Amino acid sequence: MKIFKNLWIVLLVISLLLVGCTSKEKATTETEKETGEQQSYTVVDDRGIELTFEKVPETVVTLLPSITETLFELGVGDKIIGVSQNDTYPEEALEIERVADFETVNAERIVELNPDIVFASASNEGQIEQLESTGLKVFVIESALSVEDVYGDIGQIAQVMKAEEQGEKIVEAIKSQIASVQEKTSTLDKKKNVYFEISPAPEVWSIGSNTFQQELIEAAGIENVFAKQEGWFAVTEEDIINVNPEVIVTTVNFGDDPEGEIMSRAGWSTITAIQNKEVYLIDPDIVSRPGPRIGEAIELMAKTVYPELFK
């Protein structure tokens, strides 16, 4: 069981690194030129590489769930012919061929599919070179660390797919949802603090600053008890007892009763969150994917911690 949990932690951190490694400013400039009746256009990816398209891509492979969700929101999900094993939303994504998992990308299969464009993470460096060597276009998006980064991602993807108007609508809808949440949380006299658990006992992990999840927590009007630390890290049970969180949120749907497992941990009975039974399981996909559901993620966090504001 311990070996299994160790592997689980490694896979979890890999998946989180895919959504939170380096901050960046988005390059979203686009140029067009006339080519007879059709216009070619150029979009710059996060490597600073210009990709020129003679026509709008008709077939797409995406190696990140957040990009898959964005493509569906843009109304071009029907063009996707390959996704990663982690793509679970929307339901239509479950029917698409899997060409990657946590650790590997099936580059040979992607080459066989011969998509017009491959959307990839900067962490797929080796596979990117392999795919590009065959002549495939690969558009690289670095990991988002902030809501602003996500807006930039959506804008870039929309430009590639010539769906800029819909991309702008998605961003405006997200901003509106976040503003609605923050209007409610602005009435709070005092913010609650939270311990955010991303790996179960005995090898407990949490998150701090410079992570996508930290930005969601702050936007939801909540304070992170480990905000002074950076990235993803292991914490001891003594650390958690000492910071005495008012709320505990876990994204670990591990076992039959994740909330009950936390409530019954030895030595935790003095923690305020345990005493007040404020321990909650939250959908890990929504709060770990920097895509079009970030407004929903922030609202979910706020509703979980401050349910009285949403009655």
What are these regions (language model features)?
Residues 2-8, 12, 19-66, 165-195, ...:
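Bacterial Sec-exported substrate-binding components of ABC uptake systems
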